[in-house]
């Protein structure tokens, strides 16, 4: 409705854009993401495909092995399962206080994600009752917290562009 905002985002650009939009709207808001993709066999991720492509070009692995890696690097729905921009920004949203604790990196295929979405809905209604808006949550202290968390997780450098843009809002 027009009194609350819940949004589901899961790739690198929409998350910062969503957070900036929430800052502009300045209304009771909670973000819930669609979760993180499962890792492939032997913890294979999309991030490794470039390395395997180079290995194939050098003759270190076969075309068949490269094709196998390409077909198994993204075994489920969800954000990339490495510490790229999407995962970093999901963690930043949680560190800023716009996601429920523990929700930033939940697996997309986890049944608990539905429960977290339900809790997010209940929480946003509590924010409405209490009149708590984004500007009440995302304070200078919240940004300091997010920056410390970013350093602790060795987050994506792209987020170092997104965080000041969000603060500007």
Where do the protein language model's features map onto the residues?
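Flexible, glycine-rich loop/tail regions that form catalytic "lids" or insertion modules at the edges
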Residues: 147-149
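Residues at secondary-structure transition points
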Residues: 103, 160-161
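Alpha-helical support elements that line or immediately flank enzyme active sites
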Residues: 161-169
């Amino acid at each position: 409705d027009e009194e609350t905002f819940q949004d589901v985002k899961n790739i690198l650009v929409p998350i910062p854009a969503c957070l900036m939009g929430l800052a502009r709207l300045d209304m009771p808001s909670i973000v819930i993401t669609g979760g993180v993709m499962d890792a492939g066999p032997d913890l294979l991720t999309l991030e490794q495909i470039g390395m395997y492509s180079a290995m194939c070009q050098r003759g270190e692995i076969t075309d068949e092995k490269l094709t196998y890696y390409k077909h198994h690097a993204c075994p489920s729905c969800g954000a990339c399962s490495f510490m790229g921009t999407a995962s970093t920004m999901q963690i930043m949203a949680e560190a800023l206080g716009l996601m429920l604790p523990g929700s930033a990196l939940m697996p997309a295929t986890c049944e608990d994600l539905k429960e977290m979405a339900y809790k997010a809905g209940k929480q946003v209604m509590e924010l409405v009752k209490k009149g708590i808006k984004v500007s009440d949550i995302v304070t200078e202290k919240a940004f300091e917290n997010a920056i410390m968390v970013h350093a602790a997780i060795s987050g994506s450098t792209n987020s170092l562009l997104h965080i000041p843009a969000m603060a500007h809002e």
